[in-house]
Amino acid sequence: VVRLGQNFLADPNLLEAIVRDAQLRPDDVVLEVGAGEGVLSERLAGAAAHLHTVEIDRRLEPALERVAVLPNVDLHWGDAMKLDLAALRPRPTAIVANLPYSVATPLVLRTIEELPALERWTVMVQREIAERLRAAPGSRTYGAPSAIAQLACEVELVRAVDPAVFNH
């Protein structure tokens, strides 16, 4: 698991806060990138009409069995950067993800481009990525990702997360 840089959310209060922050509606179709051990997936499946959850690490298959059997869940194995997002049915209206540094910016930009029905992105990223995505024009960190993200949605930093809430 270390090879993939997996960090699993372990704090139940934070998991509930993420679901609240996502402001999911009962008719939402959620795309979760990085199912991990499925603890957030279960909560998302309970709050939305449908959940597409993506996990790259097959070693997590035993932990995700309880999520995969839920009637409103489609579990997709593989790299989210290679997944045919436009082919997902039903089409996602929200994304909730704890994104690793290496794919955070490209994946956010890819979902903006390829999933026009997305209404909300609730993504956990490293602080520097969040600051880059919400950077003001003319600032040192402003660039194409900032402009694209800000044209597509309102970018806000919701909370800082203590590293202690993760299991490695």
Question: Model-found features: residue ranges?
Answer:
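Catalytic cores of RNA-modifying enzymes
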Residues: V1-H168
